[in-house]
Design a protein with these regions (language model features):
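Histidine-centered active-site/metal-ligand motif
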Residues: 2, 59, 97
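Single conserved hydrophobic/aromatic residue that forms the stacking wall/gate
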Residues: 2-13
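Conserved short histidine dyad/triad with adjacent acidic residue
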Residues: 14-16, 22-32, 41-59, 93-94
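Ligand-binding loop in jelly-roll beta-barrel domains
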Residues: 24, 36, 84-85, 93-114
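Short acidic-glycine-tyrosine-enriched beta hairpin
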Residues: 29, 77-92
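Solvent-exposed residues in well-ordered beta-strands and their adjoining turns
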Residues: 44-48, 77, 112-114
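Short, conserved beta-strand element in jelly-roll/cupin
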Residues: 58-74
């Protein structure tokens, strides 16, 4: 779906693809919102070969992730965590972190970067 609807306001916004890294597909959920305090994204992680190294990233601030579909291997500061549908995590995004889709299936998650 390319549209986001605010039920209370009736406004419709087009999701905007954003390239934060080539490792994952990001869609901004607040593109065009002036003065926002957070950056919400719908993120898709496609499965990769088992032997492919995980891409690690770090950026200022904090990050909240909630898995919407699939199973995700999340590495934060050399610690591995497995998140399943409905699981969420809030962490210091200045620490090196990366994600990998598990079970040969793509993963979708909500990411909010503060």
């Amino acid at each position: 779906r390319d549209l986001v609807r605010s039920r209370g306001l009736g406004d419709v916004y087009k999701r905007q693809a954003v390239e934060r890294t080539k490792a994952y597909k990001y869609q901004s959920l607040a593109a065009g919102f002036v003065g926002r305090k957070a950056d919400p994204f719908l993120v898709t992680v496609h499965p990769k070969p088992e032997d492919e190294p995980m891409y690690l990233n770090s950026h200022p601030g904090q990050e909240y992730n909630m898995v919407l579909k699939g199973r995700l291997l999340l590495q934060i500061n050399n610690k591995d965590l497995i998140l399943e549908e409905g699981d969420s995590i809030y962490f210091n995004s200045e620490l090196p972190h990366g994600m990998k889709a598990l079970d040969g299936e793509k993963v979708s998650f909500l990411a909010v970067i503060l």
